[in-house]
Design a protein with these regions (language model features):
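Catalytic-core segments of class I nucleotidyltransferases/pyrophosphorylases
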Residues: 88, 102-105, 132-216
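N-terminal nucleotide-binding beta1-loop-alpha1 segment
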Residues: 1-6
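Conserved N-terminal catalytic core of the sugar/cofactor nucleotidyltransferase
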Residues: 13-14, 18-89
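The conserved acidic donor/metal-binding loop of glycosyltransferases
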Residues: 92-95
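Extended, small-residue-rich solenoid/repeat segments and analogous flexible loops
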Residues: 182-270
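Anionic-ligand binding region
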Residues: 110, 119-143
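Conserved donor-nucleotide/metal-binding helix-loop-beta segment in metal-dependent transferases, i.e.
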Residues: 98-121
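Glycine-rich hexapeptide-repeat left-handed beta-helix
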Residues: 281-387
Length: 387
C-alpha cells in the first residue's frame, strides 16, 4: 500500500470518506456485535484518536498493543484473557457484508470464511471437502483451488491451545495458517462458510474498487451550500461547510467532505470521494478517484482512476493519464493491476508545477516535487525533486 501507508496504518486509509476499519465496524455492529478489541501496532495513535472507546458508534472498544509484529496468531494470543466463549476475528483490511457476519455468528465450531476468487495472487487458498477445510496453500502459484481464506473467522476457545502449539515460522512470526492447520487435525476440525461478497485490500488500486462498491449505496445529502446553475445528477452527498459553485456538474455517486471549495465550472464524475478541506477548481475533471483531505486540484487538471494523498497540490494544467495507448492492463512496479484504466498513486504532500504530466500507473512518494512540464512515470521515491 505504500506510499499511502507511510503516514498511516492501512486500516485508516479512506474509502467513501471513512477509514476501511470503520466500514468494517459498522457492518459488525449491524450484525449485532457491540464489543470490540482492536489489536493495534503501527501508528496506533491514529486508530485510538479516531475511535476512542467507541461511544460515537454505540459500541465498546478496547485495545491490545502488538508492539512486535509477530504474526496474526500472536495477535490473537494477546487477547486470550479479554474474551469469553466463542468470538469473531476479522482482518482489518477487508470489506465484508453484515449478512455473512450474521450467518457466521450462528455457528458453534471453529469456522473459516472463504470466497471464490478469479485472481489468487497474494491470497491464502484453501481446499474444501464435506463443509470443512482440508488443506491450506499460503500464497502459492497455481493453487489447486479457487477458494480463498477471507480473513474472517469464528473461533472457540480451542484456538488458544492451537496457537500455543504453533511454532515460529522461518520469517519469525506465529502464522495463523499454522494454527488453523492444527485445528483442522484436531477435535471437530475446521469448518468453512462461503461468503456472498468480499473485497481484499492488498494494493493501492484495490481502494478504487472498494470505494466504488461503498459509494453504490450512497444516499443524497446536502449539508453545505450549492449555488445556482449547479447540476447534481444521481446520488451526491455534500458535507457541512462545503460550497459548490456555479457551473459545477457532478454525476453521482459522489461524496464530498466538509469545508471543501468546489468549482466553479468543474466536472466530477461517478465513484469519486473527496475528503475534507479539498479544493476542486475551475476547468477540473475528476473521475473515479479518491482525493484525501486538504488536497488542492485548483485549475485545468484531469484526475482519473487515481488515489491522491493528503495535502497535495496540483499545479495548473497538471494531468494524470489513466489509459495506455495500446489499451493493455496498467502495470505498477511490474505488477499487473488487472485494470485497463488506472491513473496514479500519489502519497501525501506531493506538489506539481504547471503542465506536469503523470503517466499511467505512476507511484509518487510523499513530499515530492514534480517541476513544471515534467513527465513522471514509474516509481518515484519519497522526498524527490524532479525538474
Amino acid at each position: 500500500m505504500r506510499p499511502l501507508t507511510a503516514n498511516r496504518p492501512k486500516v485508516m486509509l479512506p474509502i467513501a470518506n471513512r477509514p476501511i476499519v470503520e466500514h468494517l465496524l459498522l457492518e459488525l455492529r449491524e450484525a449485532g456485535i457491540g464489543e470490540f478489541i482492536f489489536i493495534v501496532g503501527y501508528c496506533d495513535e491514529q486508530v485510538r484518536s479516531y475511535f476512542s472507546a467507541g461511544e460515537k458508534w454505540g459500541v465498546s472498544i478496547a485495545y491490545s498493543d502488538q508492539r512486535k509484529q509477530l504474526g496474526t496468531a500472536d495477535a490473537i494470543r494477546q487477547v486470550g484473557g479479554m474474551v469469553d466463549g466463542n468470538f469473531i476475528v476479522v482482518n482489518g483490511d477487508v470489506v465484508v457484508d453484515r449478512v455473512d457476519i450474521e450467518k457466521l455468528m450462528t455457528g458453534k465450531h471453529n469456522t473459516m470464511s472463504v470466497i471464490e476468487v478469479k485472481d489468487p495472487r497474494g491470497l491464502g487458498m484453501v481446499e474444501i471437502a464435506g463443509g470443512k477445510v482440508v488443506n491450506i496453500h499460503e500464497k502459492t502459484e497455481n493453487p489447486p483451488s479457487v477458494m480463498a481464506n477471507a480473513g474472517l473467522y469464528l473461533f472457540t476457545p480451542a484456538v488458544f491451545d492451537a496457537i500455543e502449539r504453533t511454532e515460529k515460522s522461518p520469517r519469525g512470526e506465529y502464522e495463523i495458517t499454522e494454527s488453523l492447520k492444527i485445528l483442522m487435525q484436531s477435535g471437530d476440525g475446521l469448518y468453512c462458510q462461503e461468503l456472498r461478497s468480499w473485497l481484499d485490500l492488498s494494493y493501492p488500486w484495490d481502494l478504487l474498487a472498494a470505494n466504488e462498491s461503498m459509494l453504490a449505496g450512497l444516499e443524497p445529502q446536502n449539508l453545505g451550500e450549492v449555488e445556482s446553475n449547479v447540476v447534481l445528477r444521481g446520488p451526491v452527498a455534500v458535507g457541512r461547510g462545503t460550497v459548490v459553485r456555479s457551473g459545477a456538474y457532478i454525476v453521482g455517486p459522489v461524496i464530498i467532505g466538509e469545508n471543501c471549495d468546489v468549482g466553479p465550472n468543474c466536472y466530477i464524475r461517478p465513484s469519486t470521494a473527496i475528503g475534507d478541506g479539498c479544493h476542486i477548481g475551475a476547468a477540473v475533471e475528476v473521475k473515479n478517484s479518491i482525493i484525501m483531505k486538504n488536497t488542492k486540484i485548483p485549475h485545468f487538471n484531469y484526475v482519473g482512476d487515481s488515489v491522491i494523498g493528503e495535502g497535495c497540490n496540483l499545479g495548473a494544467g497538471t494531468k494524470i493519464a489513466n489509459l495506455r495507448l495500446d489499451k493493455k492492463n496498467v502495470r505498477v512496479a511490474g505488477i499487473d493491476t488487472r485494470r485497463r484504466k488506472l491513473g496514479a498513486i500519489l502519497g501525501d504532500h506531493v506538489e506539481t508545477g504547471i503542465n506536469a504530466s503523470i503517466n499511467v500507473g505512476c507511484t509518487v512518494g510523499n513530499n515530492t516535487f514534480l517541476g513544471p512540464g515534467v513527465v513522471a512515470s514509474g516509481v518515484i521515491l519519497p522526498d524527490s525533486q524532479i525538474f
